[in-house]
Structure formats: C-alpha cells, structure tokens
C-alpha cells in the first residue's frame, strides 16, 4: 500500500510561507516548501548576489548571505498577495553587511508554485 502526500494549494503554500517568514525561519521555508529544482533569480547586475538553481545551491546562497550579516537592525515581511500560480510579498531589511556597511533594502519577492512546491523565487530591488 502506498501512502500519498496531499499536494498543498497555492493558498496553503503562501499561508505556511507567511507563518514561517513571520518568525524569520527562512531555511525552514526552503526545507519545507522549495522544490528540488527551484530557481532563485536576482535583479540583473545585483551588487549582492547571483542567481542559483537547485535546492542545494539556493540554500548555499542563503547561508553565504547570512554569514555576511554583521548586525541585524530590523526586518519586515508583508502578507502574501496571490495571483494564479504566483504569490508575492514585500520584504524590508535594515542590516549591516560585510563589504557593504549598513544597508536598508526594500524589495518585492515573487514566488511561483507548481505541484504544491515553490519552483521559483525572484527578487526585485
């Protein structure tokens, strides 16, 4: 007998994302909600990052970012707005980053969901 796992709807994925983001549990979001073939897309010519593809490389990108944070001054994440197979949140951070100093960044984070998992994260800042 095979036990199949129920596929989450986009509303369920967005709600779980919101719950974890509100607790600043970004790696848990990746572990629980990201597909193995997830893509992470940064703005062209970003001074901070390059894109990554695959759950492992996307995780490594996040870990490298966290290592560079020298001081965390504050952050917020808005509630998700859902449209079709995508949801978006606003995210603001006030952080001191190695090599950049103190930065305040406001961005839109767009996520695409397929088969109950996040297959794309794209950042606009």
Regions found by a protein language model. Name each.
Residues 1-28, 32-36:
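Short, low-complexity N-terminal intrinsically disordered segments enriched in polar/charged residues
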Residues 7, 27-80, 85:
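A solvent-exposed, acidic/Ser-Thr-rich amphipathic alpha-helical stretch
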Residues 39, 101, 117-119:
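Residue-level signal for well-ordered, solvent-exposed loop/turn and beta-edge residues enriched
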Residues 40, 89-90, 120-121:
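Short hydrophobic/aromatic-rich beta-strand segments that constitute the beta-sheet cores
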Residues 68-71, 95-104:
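Short, cysteine-centered beta-strand-loop-beta hairpins and adjacent loop/turn segments enriched
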Residues 74-76, 103-109:
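Short, surface-exposed coil-to-beta transition loops
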Residues 83-93:
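A short hydrophobic beta-strand element
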Residues 106-125:
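Short beta-strand edge/turn micro-motifs at domain boundaries
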């Amino acid at each position: 007998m095979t036990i199949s796992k129920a596929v989450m709807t986009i509303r369920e994925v967005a709600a779980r994302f919101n719950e974890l983001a509100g607790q600043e549990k970004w790696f848990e979001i990746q572990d629980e909600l990201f597909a193995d073939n997830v893509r992470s897309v940064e703005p062209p010519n970003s001074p901070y990052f390059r894109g990554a593809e695959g759950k492992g490389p996307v995780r490594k990108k996040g870990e490298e970012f966290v290592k560079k944070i020298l001081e965390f001054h504050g952050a917020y994440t808005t509630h998700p707005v859902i449209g079709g197979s995508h949801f978006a949140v606003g995210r603001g951070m006030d952080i001191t980053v190695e090599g950049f100093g103190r930065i305040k960044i406001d961005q839109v984070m767009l996520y695409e969901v397929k088969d109950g998992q996040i297959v794309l994260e794209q950042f606009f800042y």
